[in-house]
UniProtKB/Swiss-Prot annotation:
Source organism: Sulfurisphaera tokodaii (strain DSM 16993 / JCM 10545 / NBRC 100140 / 7) (Sulfolobus tokodaii)
EC number(s) from the headed UniProt entry: 2.7.4.9
Keywords: ATP-binding, Kinase, Nucleotide biosynthesis, Nucleotide-binding, Transferase
Encoding gene, per UniProt annotation: tmk
Record field: catalytic activity: dTMP + ATP = dTDP + ADP
Binding site for ATP: G11, I12, D13, G14, S15, G16, K17, S18
Classification via Pfam families: Thymidylate_kin (PF02223)
The protein's name in its UniProt record: Probable thymidylate kinase
Amino acid sequence: MKKGVLIAFEGIDGSGKSSQATLLKDWIELKRDVYLTEWNSSDWIHDIIKEAKKKDLLTPLTFSLIHATDFSDRYERYILPMLKSGFIVISDRYIYTAYARDSVRGVDIDWVKKLYSFAIKPDITFYIRVSPDIALERIKKSKRKIKPQEAGADIFPGLSPEEGFLKYQGLITEVYDKLVKDENFIVIDGTKTPKEIQIQIRKFVGELIDNSF
């Protein structure tokens, strides 16, 4: 049986990581079974989280725990079984998103790491790195509104959406940058064109898949 491979994508909102994850999935499925999972997408917990955020019910600790519940559900029902069946699993955000988002809310990062210690580490993690300024410009050009969670509205309620976005995503970036060495992130320059980024990613993944037989 082919060996399952876990590929994770991380990056701030507006970095383009989701688009890259989808492009990679489309390429891989031409040759292998592939499954794409996204952060906060559990069948039964997603709507609960959405409603709790809308009503501003989440403290930093409950924010951490409820997202861990979402992840553990997807991990046990989809990610792990797919890997055991030989699938290539692409995760649009993985446990490192929790490390960053929870810790900037004041939750001890070592506690968060223990909370997610049941999860296996990815075979490769791509960190699509762009500055918050560039990410903000991309969102503005797309003509969509900044989501409250993208601006850290729960921890920076007094700031405008744009100010909150820059401050919050800046803090997230600082955590990601600290994780690069310890978690063996492959740092990708997110300012390159989507095509250039995808070519670079496929080179890494192609070698990984070839070695998974």
